[in-house]
Amino acid sequence: MSRIGNKVITLPAGVEIINKDNVVTVKGPKGELTREFNKNIGITVEGTEVTVTRPNDSKEMKTIHGTTRANLNNMVVGVSEGFKKALEMRGVGYRAQLQGSKLVLSVGKSHQDEVEAPEGVTFEVPTPTTINVIGINKESVGQTAAYVRSLRSPEPYKGKGIRYVGEFVRRKEGKTGK
C-alpha cells in the first residue's frame, strides 16, 4: 500500500482542505465531508497538493498510510465530481419508482420493498428498470447500492434480480430430464 500512499493528491479548482488534529474537512462545489484519520499519519496541505506521510516503515503504518491516502482522495473526488452507482433490474414485472426520497421496488415478492435514502445519498430512476445511487461519500453510495442489490440479488439460472450495470452473472445449466 505504500506506493499508493506516496502519491500526491492534486486538488481541483474550488476544493479546499482543512486539517485540524487529523480531523480533515474537505469542502467543494458538491458539498462538505469530514473524517477523522489516525493520529500517527501526517497530512500536509501545500497549495493545491496534499501529501500523506508515515512515521516509520512498520507493516501497520504502511497499510494505514495507503488507506488514508485513498480515503482522502475519495473525499476530494466526491466533493468535486461525486459518485454514482448504476443498477439494473431483470425479471418480469420488476420495477422501481420514486416516492419522495424513498425508492419503492417491485421485485417479485408479495409486498413492495421500500428503501429510505440515507443522508447524503439520492436515488434516480431514469427508466422503471434502472436505478442510479448518487452521492458525495463513496462509502455510503457503495453500501446503499449493495443493500438495494441484496433485496433481490441475481440468481444463476435465469439471471433475474437486481445487478450492477455491466456486472457478469455466472449462469448455471438447469436440471436435465431423463
UniProtKB/Swiss-Prot annotation:
Gene3D superfamilies from the UniProt entry: Ribosomal protein L6, alpha-beta domain
Keyword set, alphabetical order: Ribonucleoprotein, Ribosomal protein, RNA-binding, rRNA-binding
UniProt GO cellular component terms: cytosolic large ribosomal subunit
GO molecular function: rRNA binding; structural constituent of ribosome
GO biological process, one term: cytoplasmic translation
Keyword Protein biosynthesis in record: no
InterPro entries: Ribosomal_uL6-like, Ribosomal_uL6-like_a/b-dom_sf, Ribosomal_uL6_a/b-dom, Ribosomal_uL6_bac-type, Ribosomal_uL6_CS
Record-linked Pfam families: Ribosomal_L6
Annotated family: Belongs to the universal ribosomal protein uL6 family.
NCBIfam families according to UniProt: L6_bact
HAMAP family: Ribosomal_uL6_B
Role played: This protein binds to the 23S rRNA, and is important in its secondary structure. It is located near the subunit interface in the base of the L7/L12 stalk, and near the tRNA binding site of the peptidyltransferase center.
Binding partners and assembly: Part of the 50S ribosomal subunit.
Name assigned to this protein: Large ribosomal subunit protein uL6
